[in-house]
Amino acid sequence: MATLMNPVRDPNTLSNYNNWLCTHTTANFEIFFEEKKLVGNVVHKLRSITNAETDEIILDSHHVDIRNVQVAGLPVKAWELLPPLGPYGTALKIKLENPVGLNEIIDVDIAVQTTKECTALQWLTPAQTSNKKHPYMFSQCQAIHARSIFPCQDTPDVKCTFDFNITSPLPVIASGLPVRSTSTVPQSGVKTLHRFHQKVPIPSYLFALASGDIAEAAIGPRSVVATSPDKLEECKWELEADTERFIKTIEEIIYPYAWGEYNVLILPPSFPYGGMENPVFTFATPSIISKDRENVDVIAHELAHSWSGNLVTSASWEHFWLNEGWTVYLERRILASLHGEKYRHFSAIIGWKALRDSVEHYSHDHEFTKLVPNLKGEDPDDAFSTIPYEKGFNFLFHLENLVGKEKFDRFIPHYFTTFKGKSLDSYDFKATLLDFFKSDAEASRLLQELDWDSWFYKPGLPPKPEFDTSLADVVYELAGKWRSLPESPFQPQPSDIQGLTANQIVVFLEQILLFERPLTAELSKLMGEVYGLTGSENIEVANLYLQVGLKAADKSVIGPTTDLLGRIGRMKFVRPLYRALQKVDRQVAIDTFEKHKDFYHPICRGMVEKDLFGKKDA
């Protein structure tokens, strides 16, 4: 009966969140660097959403060491870990002695510590940090890894407020606003309690912690950058010119920023993503610090998540495009406001290439190439690709062109107001869009005639939009000259790329990678030398040039490739480089992975293992 009243929308949680709703979580943890574990307890305030119709609470958990459980301040003996169920872990079942009425709230206090199998935490030795002085720890809970830190309702369909009470000998950052105290600044090595409060309800995947040798510098009136002290000045320079401009621009598109501060933590290089939109503190890869301010698009993306994803959230990972497609759309709207509409289209062209690559990797009829895939029984990490980002963007871009940009602009704040603080699925989105335009006969007709089922459920590539290619044409032309070699008289010169942005060089290299007949090893080497690509500090450029060299079977790039694979853990670079390297020399690829696998985050390590040794669904 309860299940019918409150249907579960998320197939990737084992929790009975259709019976109980977490309204607040207090996380009390001490960080033990030597033992590489967190020890403490979590207190969940759970509100009953049935009227005494269930006598058990089921929470997601995976590889956690549970010491004891209390409900309403009293010890509970009748708790157990259920048998493991694939990637979803071993759910914690707590039996209640007394029924709980509708809307009554109970406190569930769980003493817990993490284990070495925890998939959410990465522990770095001092040698793995930039100044090599102190150990470092950071979390990455998306998609379903929060359950490996503490038992919880690990689903984006549930949001609650948070208090963090974290004890550590080193500075701490969390996904809440710091509770500033009047006490003196803690001394390094002395265990100190760090408190944070998150007043905006967030899903479990946005629970975030980091601790290490971290210093901060202001990059705007409501923003700081935090990173290793030896990298602070270069990170400050990279971000201070654009961060506040980005915030003001997106506030004009939607409505004011809701989280108080917008800060950026630049993590050590093993962080597996470009960025993670943890509230208050975006966690970002050091690969954006390119010393030319050309890679800060990542910050525009993570900032946009403060509305799409963090305030308005997909109800399950099957509807992940509602987080990422919207965020890419908003990121490109920010860039268009600052740099012009041509820049938005140019960014979309780069995105289309990434989308095509992902579809080809999976195959055109694969479930994971759908905008709304079926993830029942699947690990959401296996479905992680550019597809929800770029297919989602292209759907929203199509809707914008369908009804007209001016009309769609009015829908944007309406949508983000309607679902503020809530989770939704694709059907909620469709219903809201249709309802908004019902009084506009023309827009309503166009939306009713739209083939929604094809957009949601058809695998492969969507229809390709007409992009403004003006910023791309110059690099298409240059790529065409390289395609004509060695037969043509074209002689490459450094002036060929003079005045091009890093993103234009990225598109140029992506065009080279599309050649049906790869460059010869000699031409690949010539390109690197003449255009200065071999020593580029911009990893977006360097990694693509290495892929060009590997595709050309240029043995001279194998060394730089293995070197880069030992310096960066961002999956965007690591996975394609390993795939390309193994085609040239599989043993070198395997040896490189074995050498560096402990450097990579567990999520990245697992995905590369699948790429090198396992199933194609990765």
UniProtKB/Swiss-Prot annotation:
Write down the chemical reaction(s) this protein catalyses.
Answer: an epoxide + H2O = an ethanediol
Q: Where, by residue number, does a peptide bind?
A: Q140, C141, Q142, P272, Y273, G274, G275, M276, E277
What are the entry keywords?
Answer: Cytoplasm, Hydrolase, Metal-binding, Metalloprotease, Nucleus, Protease, Zinc
SUPFAM superfamilies reported in the protein's UniProt record: ARM repeat, Leukotriene A4 hydrolase N-terminal domain, Metalloproteases ('zincins'), catalytic domain
The protein's matches in Gene3D superfamilies, at most eight in alphabetical order, are given as: 3.30.2010.30, Neutral Protease Domain 2 (1.10.390.10), Peptidase M1, leukotriene A4 hydrolase/aminopeptidase C-terminal domain (1.25.40.320), tricorn interacting facor f3 domain (2.60.40.1730)
Q: Where in the cell is it found?
A: Cytoplasm; Nucleus
Question: What does the record give as cofactor?
Answer: Zn(2+)
Which family does this protein fall into?
Answer: Belongs to the peptidase M1 family.
Function as written in the Swiss-Prot or TrEMBL entry: Aminopeptidase that preferentially cleaves di- and tripeptides. Also has low epoxide hydrolase activity (in vitro). Can hydrolyze the epoxide leukotriene LTA(4) but it forms preferentially 5,6-dihydroxy-7,9,11,14-eicosatetraenoic acid rather than the cytokine leukotriene B(4) as the product compared to the homologous mammalian enzyme (in vitro).
Q: What is this protein called?
A: Leucine aminopeptidase 2
Q: What is the lineage of its organism?
A: Eukaryota, Fungi, Dikarya, Ascomycota, Pezizomycotina
